[in-house]
């Protein structure tokens, strides 16, 4: 299995392309100059394209991924109705979802042969919209509205339109600020990191109709932490055994173990990391975690070790200015 790591640095308007080997070493393959401040990125389900959101001219760009080394070639672009904060796709590669924090909306762009061709839907009124997350069955889009302390639930129609479910939303505790999410591989649980109180909620998917319930909320900060809480990102290993979330003020990654059924999280430890970790990701083998320091202008590679999933630093690498996003592609 070959793996490529992509890092987005908006201040220098660059994407760095890295080869990741089995020992956790990165080798630089390419530096792409992007026409704008590049932030969110996602790889298409078929591994052939990288979709990125840029500003101040709000667009989604599509880059072809070379099958031999992961290098990027620009392919297409499509306009967006707001500054892109988060980008994702449905599991069949038919649509791109973009959440916009500043515009307070989520948009759906249709893909044709892997390329973005037209905007098909926009839902407004999502104050502080910070991500858009399709359920494993490709039926329901979960959209955290950070400033409203709610997660809105939409059914994805065959033509890409979003229809509010019943109930149309669930609420977090006041002041939590739901931000980013991941789903457990067993498809029965989801985990949402809350930016403003640096906690993680465990949501149970109770039935195929989209009904969900919060079954656990866990503080992700050390007991003696007294500064402003500012959580950012969350990811789970492919086997569902370990979960990680980061806080930018503390510049740390919290390590969680996940119960066998996915319903219970336990804090296993805290890993100091690059200054102001805005984004990170886990490789497809579940062996390495790559974190980006927005203030250090570096990324760090960690090996995931032992039954607790604790992190051991393998190396750090200079990237562009203000790195914010990391994605990993395997082929």
Curated annotation (Swiss-Prot):
It comes from the Bacteria. GO terms for biological process: glucose metabolic process; pentose-phosphate shunt, oxidative branch. Pfam families: Lactonase. Transmembrane segments: none annotated. The keyword Hydrolase applies. Pathway: Carbohydrate degradation; pentose phosphate pathway; D-ribulose 5-phosphate from D-glucose 6-phosphate (oxidative stage): step 2/3. One of its GO terms (molecular function) is 6-phosphogluconolactonase activity. It is an enzyme of class 3 (hydrolase). GO terms for cellular component: cytosol. Its EC number is 3.1.1.31. Belongs to the cycloisomerase 2 family. This is 6-phosphogluconolactonase. It comes from Salmonella typhimurium (strain LT2 / SGSC1412 / ATCC 700720).
């Amino acid at each position: 299995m070959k793996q490529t790591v992509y890092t987005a640095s908006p201040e220098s308007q660059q994407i760095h392309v890295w080869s990741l080997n089995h020992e956790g070493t990165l080798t630089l393959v390419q530096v792409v100059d992007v026409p704008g401040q590049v932030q969110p990125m996602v790889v298409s389900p078929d591994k052939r394209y990288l979709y990125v959101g840029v500003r101040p001219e709000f667009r989604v760009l599509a880059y072809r991924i070379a099958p031999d080394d992961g290098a990027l070639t620009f392919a297409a672009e499509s306009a967006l109705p707001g500054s892109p904060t988060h980008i994702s796709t449905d599991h069949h590669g038919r649509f791109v979802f973009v959440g916009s924090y500043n515009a307070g909306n989520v948009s759906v762009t249709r893909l044709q042969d892997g390329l973005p061709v037209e905007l098909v839907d926009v839902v407004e009124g999502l104050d502080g919209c910070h991500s858009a997350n399709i359920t494993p069955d490709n039926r329901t889009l979960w959209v955290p509205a950070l400033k409203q302390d709610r997660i809105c639930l939409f059914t994805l129609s065959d033509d890409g339109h979003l229809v509010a479910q019943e109930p149309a939303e669930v609420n977090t505790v006041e002041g939590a600020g739901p931000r980013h999410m991941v789903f457990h591989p067993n498809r029965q649980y989801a985990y949402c990191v809350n930016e403003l109180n640096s906690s993680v909620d465990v949501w149970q998917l109770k039935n195929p109709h989209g009904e969900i319930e919060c079954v656990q909320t866990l503080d992700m900060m050390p007991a003696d932490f007294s500064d402003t809480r500012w959580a950012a990102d969350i990811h789970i290993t492919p086997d569902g055994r370990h979960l990680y979330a980061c806080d930018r003020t503390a510049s740390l990654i919290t390590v969680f173990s996940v119960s066998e059924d996915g319903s219970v999280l336990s804090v296993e430890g805290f890993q100091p990391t690059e200054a102001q970790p805005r984004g990170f990701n886990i490789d497809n083998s579940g062996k390495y975690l790559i974190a980006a320091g927005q203030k250090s202008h570096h990324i760090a590679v960690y090996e995931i070790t032992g039954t607790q999933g604790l992190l051991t630093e393998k190396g750090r690498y200079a990237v562009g200015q203000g790195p914010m996003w990391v994605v990993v592609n395997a082929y």
